[in-house]
Amino acid sequence: MSPTSKIVPNIMCSITGNPKSGKTHLALTFPKPLAIFSFDIGLERVIRHFDPKDFTIHTYPMPITTSSKSKGLGKEIQAMWSKFNDEYIAATEDPEIKTLVVDTGTAVYEIVRLAKAAELGNESLLRFQYGDVYARMRGLLQRARVAGKNLVITHYLKD
């Protein structure tokens, strides 16, 4: 490391729990201001307990589907991924933002996975095609780390 390098301390945190167990509430207690990327319903229930000037909210309503495949949702999913990625990058570059909150990481993973399948013209991915999905997810973590932002990602427990 060169003598001019600056290490910016930050927190990388995953909060996992059952629905309505306080995951988002805990995330909103991190250093302000926050950029919230909400893929989950229920943010409105929690957000009213906090000062609205402390956060920027980006919402991404998940399409209703009965399949793990992107059948008929390709363009919609790709547009959602592109919008999220652009807004996430902008938040990491905003010097005012201290914390990024992704609610939920599970939803982001599904968006990334389905968007990649749509890019390839497929409804789903084969095992060897997940490299780009993992790279995109890793990129979200790395971008926050390099920018010196706190990153909080919520997840639901799975059976």
Task: Walk through the language-model features, giving the residues of each.
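P-loop NTPase motor core
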Residues: 99-159
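Conserved P-loop
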Residues: 2-99, 107
